[in-house]
Amino acid sequence: MSNYIVTFKDGVSKDEIQKFKDEVTSEGGEIGHTYDGLISGFSAKIQPQTLQAFQQQASISDSVIETIEPDSTVTIQ
C-alpha cells in the first residue's frame, strides 16, 4: 500500500468525496488528512486495486478527480 494525495475538481460535493474515501477504507486503505481549503481532497494509504480504479476514473473526461499523486516530502532549498 502506498501513500497518495487525491484531489477533486472545483464544485465536487463533500458527499461525493466521501464516497471515494469510503471506497479507500472499505478496501483496507487508510485516510490520512482531508483537504477542504484551496484544494478539495484527501491523503490516503491506498490499496493497488483501489488506486487502479481511481486512475481509470480520473482518465475519463468528465471525471470529478483532478489528480492522483504520490504523497511525498517537499523541501525548499
Model-based region annotation:
Residues 17-27, 53-62:
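Short amphipathic alpha-helices in soluble, non-transmembrane regions
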Residues 9, 26-30:
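Intrinsically disordered, low-complexity segments enriched in small/polar residues
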Residues 7-15, 46:
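Short, surface-exposed ligand-recognition loops at beta-strand->loop->(often short) alpha-helix junctions
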Residues 32-77:
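Autoinhibitory propeptides
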Residues 1-4:
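Short structural boundary motif marking the start of a folded domain
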